[in-house]
Amino acid sequence: MVTLGDLKTPKTNTWCPGCGNFGILMAFKKALIDLGIEREDAVLVSGIGCHGKMVNYVNINGFHGIHGRALPLATGIKLANHNLTVVGFAGDADQYNEGWGHFAHAVRLNLDMTLIVHDNMVLGLTTGQATSTSQQGFKSKSTPFGVIPPMLNPLAHALVSNGTFVARGFSGDMLHLKGLIVQAIKHRGFAFIDVFQPCVSFNYLNTYDWFRNRVYKLEEENHDITDRKKALEKAFEWGDRIPIGIFYNKERPTYYDNLPHIKDEKLTKLPTENVDITSTINEMT
């Protein structure tokens, strides 16, 4: 059985003191322990941003990709070996800006993996520019007069793209977030969690206290997680009360279920000896 000690790495953590990433890191580690997933059976993929250092701080197989491209990497890994537990980590700018096209199609295809987005509503690694989820009026280095367009709603987009598991967490409530991650990894299909992750250095608006005074848990209000329309209504709640928890959870066939050549056997186990691709190469040259 894997332990916290097993998941520790020798890398020095360089996140700012009080960063919301710490709550996500611990929630993820504890979720792996609760699920009994061995290190060799899991792969972590990340993009560019403060969140990207997750691959340095969890002692499992990892791939630190380029900006916005965690999902294509995760897709390839899962296609090659569908027995692996594949978890992608991204930031709000990373996934909802450069990686937006990948996000929409990963949800639609129902790829069997988990995506956890560290949503601090600001570009932290580059010292404080606005992102797609920054609130209107938010003043930053890139928007000195305030953000003009309305903020992107990733949960609503996931729901209308026929997402099968859509959730939101808060890194200030680590135990609740751990439970969401456990359920997401258990889900057979594309599981998406947007996590409110306060940036203590550059987001002066969306602080820990700001979230604590507003968030409430859907499970405490008897929310029906199988009702997509109700989930969509909840996704648009924003203001004095903001819901967290599982908005929607209803399985449907995954993308891999319709690929007969990998349905029963993983690609990494298929024989490659005596394979001649000369004719294929000739057709393309």
Stretches with model-predicted labels:
Residues 94-97, 169-178, 223-228:
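Active-site glycine- and acidic-residue-rich loops that bind
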Residues 11, 38-42, 80-86, 108-113, ...:
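Short coil/turn connectors at secondary-structure junctions
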Residues 1, 10, 199-285:
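Flexible, low-complexity linker and terminal segments
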Residues 46, 50-123:
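Thiamine diphosphate
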Residues 131-184:
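Conserved thiamine diphosphate
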Residues 4-66:
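Active-site diphosphate/adenylate-binding microenvironment
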Residues 48-50, 120-122, 173, 196-202, ...:
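Glycine-rich beta-alpha junction loops
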Residues 129-136, 174, 181-190, 203-218, ...:
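Short, surface-exposed, charged loop/turn segments at secondary-structure junctions
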